[in-house]
């Protein structure tokens, strides 16, 4: 049984960044993984600030395995690349006022997959990328293009060459299980029958209505349904019990559990407004387990490589979930 509830995180976790941490291997027993939903191998995002893409695709991968019987290892960098190309055009037309960054939130990963499709990890997995360096390079090219009024066609070609190389045949499509797919067709097939419901819980907006979540990385101003946190907790438990993974975004667990004594909604609101809870990281919740005291723990699949945590996984307590969750994505059963 699990001996320890928490991964002791380094002080840098106080900063809002989702890139890979220094190695912090936890030697806790891995027996809890027997309670996990089936997943693909843990990925390592390295210096790519796109945990939200990694977490979302991890959910799609597990959903496909558990409920459709097919194992697909998907390429987060495919969406990162398309996002930067998209932002280059937007930044150019806005004369440099639109941001160029790979930071975002879960609903935008869903949007990108629908818009640009997907390819397999084995066909597009460039190594040692630094998303901040790529964003700076794109911004530089946008700035030059604006200065010389080059137009979108020339800019798009220059940005395309600057980003990680895509084999020509991959652009045209690929074969999988004897069927030919373009990236767009493959993305559509992955999402067939899968729809996420995005949920958050804060008092400064009425429950039962959507609102544009005011976090720094919600560049697209996605509106999220607002519900009481206990209702969200129950939906997450139910989803996992029915073999559906859950997308999670929020503040990573700290050494000390947060208190849930008192009005939960007020505790959450205070943590948000004082920036104790930030939209720091995203993971896929892929199962439930219990400690020796019988407390429920969430099994979280991270994207910081297998050398981090417990073979790339960590455990989240009920208290951490109730206080530190910014938003979740639950598969819509309807």
Q: Model regions: which residues?
A:
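Structural recognition of the beta-strand scaffold that forms the well-ordered cores
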Residues: 50-53, 78-81, 109-112, 120-123, ...
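C-terminal motif of bacterial Sec signal peptides marking the signal peptidase cleavage site
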Residues: 15-17
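Sec-dependent signal peptide recognition
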Residues: 2-8
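Sec-exported extracytoplasmic/periplasmic mature domains
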Residues: 56-65, 114-118, 241, 290
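Bacterial Sec signal peptide processing site at the extreme N-terminus
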Residues: 19-28
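Active-site signature of cysteine proteases
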Residues: 21-22, 35, 40, 155-334
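Papain-like cysteine protease catalytic cores
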Residues: 73-177
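Active-site nucleophilic cysteine motif
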Residues: 46-60, 100-107, 281-282
């Amino acid at each position: 049984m699990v001996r320890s509830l928490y991964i002791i995180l380094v002080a840098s976790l106080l900063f809002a960044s989702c890139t890979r941490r220094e190695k912090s291997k936890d030697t806790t027993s891995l027996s809890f993984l027997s309670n996990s939903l089936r997943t693909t191998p843990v990925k390592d995002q390295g210096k790519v600030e796109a945990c939200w893409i990694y977490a979302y695709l991890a959910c799609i991968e597990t959903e496909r395995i558990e409920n459709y019987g097919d194992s697909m290892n998907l390429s987060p960098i495919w969406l990162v690349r398309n996002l930067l190309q998209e932002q280059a055009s937007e930044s150019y037309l806005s004369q440099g006022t639109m941001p160029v960054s790979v930071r975002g939130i879960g609903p935008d990963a869903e949007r990108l997959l629908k818009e640009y499709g997907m390819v397999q990890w084995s066909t597009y997995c460039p190594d040692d990328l630094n998303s901040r360096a790529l964003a700076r390079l794109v911004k530089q090219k946008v700035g030059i293009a604006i200065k010389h009024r080059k137009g979108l066609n020339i800019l798009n070609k220059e940005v395309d060459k600057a980003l990680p190389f895509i084999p020509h045949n991959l652009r045209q499509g690929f074969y999988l299980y004897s069927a030919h797919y373009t990236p767009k067709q493959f993305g559509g097939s992955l999402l067939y029958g899968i729809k996420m419901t995005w949920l958050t819980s804060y008092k400064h907006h009425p429950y039962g209505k959507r609102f544009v979540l005011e976090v720094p990385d919600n560049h697209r101003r996605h509106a999220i349904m607002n519900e009481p946190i206990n209702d969200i907790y129950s939906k997450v438990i139910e989803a996992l019990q029915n073999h559906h993974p859950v997308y999670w975004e929020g503040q990573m667990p700290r050494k000390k559990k947060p208190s849930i004594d008192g009005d939960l909604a007020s505790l959450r609101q205070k943590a948000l407004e004082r920036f104790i809870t930030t939209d720091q990281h995203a993971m896929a919740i892929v199962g439930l387990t219990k400690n020796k005291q019988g407390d429920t723990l969430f099994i979280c699949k991270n994207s910081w490589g297998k050398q981090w945590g417990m073979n790339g996984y960590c455990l989240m307590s009920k208290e951490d979930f109730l206080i530190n969750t910014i938003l979740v994505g639950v598969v819509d059963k309807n």
